Every structure is written in structure tokens, then in C-alpha cells.
Amino acid sequence: MLPQYFGLAEQEVKLLQESDLHPNVIRYFDDEKDENFLYIAVELCQASLFDLYKDGRPGEELTEAQQRLINAININAQYALYQLANGLNHLHSLRIIHRDIKPQNILIAHPSRNQKPGTVRLVISDFGLCKTLPDNVSTLIGTTGNAGTVGWKAPELISQPKELANGSATGISRDSSSSTDPVAQGVKRAVDIFSLGCVFFYVLTNGCHPFDDDEGWMQIREYNIKKEKANLKQLRLGDDSEEPYHLIQWMLKTHPEDRPTAVQVMNHPFFWSDEKRLNFLCDCSDHWEREPRDPPSDYLARLEDYSYEVLDHKRNFLGKLDHGFINSLGKQRKYTGDRMLDLLRALRNKKNHYEDMDEAVKAKVGPLPSGYLRYWTTKFPQLLMSCYECVLDCGLQGEPRFKPYFEGQTM
């Protein structure tokens, strides 16, 4: 590294030394300096995400080793992306804002000893643009400058042409304490969440970008980011698209305060196991069964509002269930087809009495937990995320029943 970059490099070394004791942050070994160069030794990695997906460009040749890495990522994309959220959470816990999350800076390292065979280990690298938050401060003022890479920066890091001409991008000509402009307001950890959302989309769509247009024009990404023109069509990938769509849409919110924290990303239903998803739906049923019904409580009314998203235009969930399954519900409780409460009760009751069902009905609904969960989510794709949103809307995420879903580690 040339002498004029020594200051930047020494900052990177310092941050690497502070943060590298984590499996999803690149490992620093040593550094040496002579009169001409600074040498930094970090762990050897196999490729970057950009090397593998190449922005989705057709006709790019991949080596066998690269194709194996792509296959390993795609087999369990949730595990791969969770690692990135985990690594970023580690940096944020150390008060480090990366400011340049992008595919070129996400590397595929060699697996650690305790990893399952065939899985990959992703690490966050390149700390040249990182900034450390002082104690008791959540925002850096006047440091937006040239942080980030075009097309991967959060909207608050993108200056308008007039602002660039006036010098406001460096915090010179404007009072940041009184300005309403996001650039002048400073940098929060949320800038990394936005960029990570773009990377999540990139991996799940094999190299597409959420702010390209339908024809894939990379040149207009920055404009689309500033104008809030996300294009998430590529994420509509069938029955399993609702959870990643919800998460990425949340991460790409225009206003920093509307984005999730790294911990919230890690605890999102996208990363939950099938067993955890099914248990959550059953806990939702248990909770709302105890709400007053005549007249309905505000919480129960809010749950039923989501029936318009979960049920189709016929407004009858019973019409989507198999005849044998409906018969197995029994006559003890009456089920009304247009009610979310009854849908959740049916799901919970048959899960709890799964072994009482005939073998023919079991074959229809599949085994617990994965087959049974999919029986419901393929018929009602928005069920899980609607219940998740309802818990948040009602402020129930801190309740003992729901707290483990929103604060516990997931993978």
C-alpha cells in the first residue's frame, strides 16, 4: 500500500484488531511497514460475492470451484445471509459503522472447524471507510463525505447535485444541527442495514439489484435509491417469498429510523426454523383466544383486520382445506371461515392433536413440523408475516409468550 494511504490503512488495521474475533468478520493476522509500503496480512478467502454472481450478467464463465460455492450458498441461503447479519451485529455492538457493505466486500472464507460439511462461511471485509461511534452517541455528524459505493449506499449518504455544488456533502456550508436534510443529519448504523438489504436481494436473486429497472440498467441505481423506486419483482419466487420480501422491504426503508437493527434482522421470521414458525402461530392462537370477544377487544379487532390480507376474495379459509381435514376438526367447536381467530385455532388444535388424525389425513397435511406448516402456508402465504406484523402492531413483542421470538438467537 502506497504511503499516501498509510493513514487510512492504519485505521483499517486498528478496526480489524478490535473486531476480528468473530467468525463472520475477516481475520487480521499482522501488519508490517517500510518506507514505501504498508503490508496487511488477513485470512485467505476463496472469492467474493461479486466474483460468484457478477451482477447477474449472462455469459460470464464460472470455475467449478465458484459454482460449488454458489450451490452451497443457494442450498441454505438463510444460513449464509444470517452470517452477514451476525457479523454486522458484531461490528455495531462495537460501535463500528462499516459504511461500504457491498458484494465485493463480502468474502467466502474457508469453513471453520465446527461448521457442517458443505456449508460456507461468509465474512465482512474492507474496513477502510469504517467509523467508530463515540460512547453515548448514535449518529456521526459531518462524516458522510464520499462514504460508500455508488449503487450500494443508503439514501441518506447520497447528496443531491445542488448539495454537492454547495459543499454540504462534507458538512462545510450547512448547520447540521438545524438541517432537515438526511446527509447533513449524519450517519447511523442504519446505513449498513440498507446496504445489507441490497446484498440480501443480490444473493437471493443470483446477482440482481433491488434498484435496477426491469431491463437491469445499473446506471440508474443511485437515482432510484434517492427516489424510493425499489424493484423487488425478482423476489416473488413462489411460496417461500413472503418472509424475505418483508425483511428486505423493511431493510430498504428510506428513513433510517424505519429500518430494523441488526438484531431485529437476525430475529426476523425469514431465519426461523419451521418448528419455530409453527410454534409462533400456535402461540398467536393461544394469545388471541384469551382476548374479549363481545365486544371484541382492540387487539382482536386488529388481528381480524389482517384477514383481508391472509384470505382470498371468497373470505372463507375452510374452502381451501381438504374435506377430510375439515371433518377431523370435529363438531365440538364451530369454525367461521372468514375469521383469523378460527383459522389459527384450527391450525393449533390439529397440530396439538396430530396423532389423533387418520393416516389418510396425515398424508394430506404432511409430517410435523415442516410438512404441516407448509400445508397451511401454501394455502395462506401471508399468514406468518401477518401474525408477525400484528404482534408488532399491538406492541406484544415484549410479552413473555412472544419475547423469545423477537430477542432470542435463531440460527
Stretches found by the model and what they are:
Residues 27-38, 46:
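Short beta-strand micro-motifs within the conserved protein kinase catalytic domain, predominantly
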Residues 104-163, 167:
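Activation segment/activation loop of eukaryotic-type protein kinase catalytic domains
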Residues 84-96:
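Protein kinase catalytic-loop region centered on the HRD/HxD motif
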Residues 254-258, 263-278:
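Terminal C-lobe "cap" of eukaryotic-type protein kinase domains
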Residues 80-81:
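Activation segment signature within eukaryotic-like protein kinase domains
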Residues 2-23:
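The N-lobe alphaC helix and its flanking beta3-alphaC-beta4 segment of protein kinase-like domains
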Residues 277-411:
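Regulatory extensions appended to serine/threonine kinase catalytic cores
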